[in-house]
Amino acid sequence: MTKKLPSELKQTRKSIQTACEFCHTKHIQCDVGRPCQNCLKRNIGKFCRDKKRKSRKRIEKHGTQPYLNLGKRLVIHDVPSKTVSPSSVHLQRDFLSSDQEKPGKTPAHNTNIQYTYNINDNFQSAGSIPRITNFNTDNGQTVLENTSNNISASQAVHLMNDPIIPTVRKSTLNLKSHFLEQHKAMQQPLATNCLVATSNVPVHSGMDTSNKSDDDVDDETNIHFDSMWCNDEYMKLKDIVDISTPFLPNNSQIFSLQESEYPNPSASTRGNSSLHLTNLLNSTKSVNDQKDSSIGHSTSTFNTYDEVVSRPFISLDMLHLNRGANANTHPSHNAKLESECDSSSHSDADLEKHDTDFISPSKFRELVKTPQDLYDNKCLIKPHNYKLAYTKLLTTLRKKFLEGAEIDKSVSVKDEHSTQKHNLRYDLEVIIRSILERYAPIFISLTSNMIEEDLLLQEVTLQRALLDLENMAKLVSCTPMCIWRRSGEICFVSNEFYSLTGFNKNLLLDRTSFIFEYLDHKSVSNYFQIFNELLAFGYNDINKRKKLLMLNACSSTSSKITEGFSFTTDGKAIFTKCNLLLSNGLYLKCACCWTVKRDSFNIPILVMGQFLPIFEMD
């Protein structure tokens, strides 16, 4: 327990109003004497003086008012009396002095004030602040007008009717008049003043709405928001769009173009929808060019937009491929596919010209055998040309599905051979549709922000993962295994796979070969639908996706997805069946497992396929 101090000691330890500098710094008890006892004990009595406290902020001298730092001043607005009405009156924010804040006669209700902001910090040249204040009553008479034309800067300025965010009523907001007045204010010689006029009219039951301006009649055609800032932003965006948008034909012109291209309404529905859309866009573009040339505007600004490549490292050269197909206005469906099949025969020579930097998987494995070799020879690794790979894949699929698939018109439709070839054509359309609808949108969203260094890192990751998978294949030596890229290019084939199929190793790895060359048509169609829907980027609801696949399976016998496939819980592997091509030209039914390997962007880079033959007993 603390010992009680005597009364004499309590008096000496009594707190004083101001301590000396030493006692204040050391936080010890000081006395009223100067020098104090603490300073005398330490032989610093000559330095003992009162601690000076910081003075509080007072009103600045020279008569400067702190209210002038708000950066707001009054600006004269000549408002004609005939335009001032209870329905179209503008509120003006005014800075009233304390002695003039209350007029001689206060209006009973419907007091409307027009306010104006001025964001200008230069007040040196402001000798006086003119002001015009209008107080309007129900009958529209002006109670107080031109109250003062000269207010000294030394008077106290108060803000009247100053909400933080003015409330804008949807029924009384007039965007057109608001921005017209703002445009006129910008044309005035007050170039140094930034004026933003805002209408804020309260709604009362006694308001007379008979005197409406012409702008109020069109008020219903404008888009209103409850926020003043939303209206400003909307109008600014609208002005930008109106200024920068080139001439576009209206709906009647588009419909007339459509009727001219397709006189028969049923012909447009039976034709290819993508071809119809391309022809329509080309026709619309030609009409725009004619309009622009007649008006006299140059279209060079808009033509340069087509030449800009926003994603230079990931692109699809679809316009150049479809340019020749769009030349004919009415090609039949079969004739178009036949022309594409014929053009694919001479496209291989063009692809080889762009394939000078290609290193076959077998040659690359001779250089890189360990992970250390991969990083030592990192200069040899370049981003894989997937654009060229998909072009070769399209050529391979055309040869597989369309080679010798011309349908003879003289043969009856009931012929089994012609029906089978028609199904093959339809299967190819299903494959392309699944790529465009299921795979491409997600892939583009994931790769939209990738740069060239990311693609290089992706290739290094692929090669590193490929080394691990090859080592695993050596350990699990009993399962035929094949590894390919997401584009289908084969990267590795195990010895058991060679023994099962009978193909030569040099045939598969010394050139660009696709896994789809060694599957039948039904297995290829199943692979693309399962890979694009479930395996490429994972899946959430397994049962829902499985039902979706079953429902979306087309009606042809060759394109139906087999019902005997299952999933893993992590979404990286699918078990199904396929028919594997043998060296003698026959197909072997196999149970297969497709496992996907993704990178850090969740983009599939490798697919590992394991095959086990199924021998059926007669």
Curated annotation (Swiss-Prot):
Keywords: DNA-binding, Metal-binding, Nucleus, Transcription, Transcription regulation, Zinc
GO cellular component: nucleus
Pfam families linked to this entry: PAS_13, Zn_clus
Subcellular location: Nucleus
Signal sequence range: none
A single BP term in Gene Ontology: cellular response to starvation
UniProt key word Transcription: yes
Biased composition (Basic and acidic residues): 335-352
DNA-binding region per Swiss-Prot/TrEMBL record: 20-48
Domain PAS: 466-538
One Gene Ontology molecular-function label: RNA polymerase II transcription regulatory region sequence-specific DNA binding
Domain of life: Eukaryota
Region (Disordered): 325-352
Chief place of localization: nucleus
Matching PANTHER family: GLUCOSE STARVATION MODULATOR PROTEIN 1, ZN(II)2CYS6 TRANSCRIPTION FACTOR (EUROFUNG)-RELATED
Family: Belongs to the ERT1/acuK family.
Function: Transcription factor which regulates nonfermentable carbon utilization. Binds specifically to 5'-CGGN(8)CGG-3' and 5'-CGGN(9)CGG-3' sequences in the promoter region.
Protein name, entry field: Glucose starvation modulator protein 1
Gene source species: Saccharomyces cerevisiae (strain YJM789)
Record gene name: GSM1
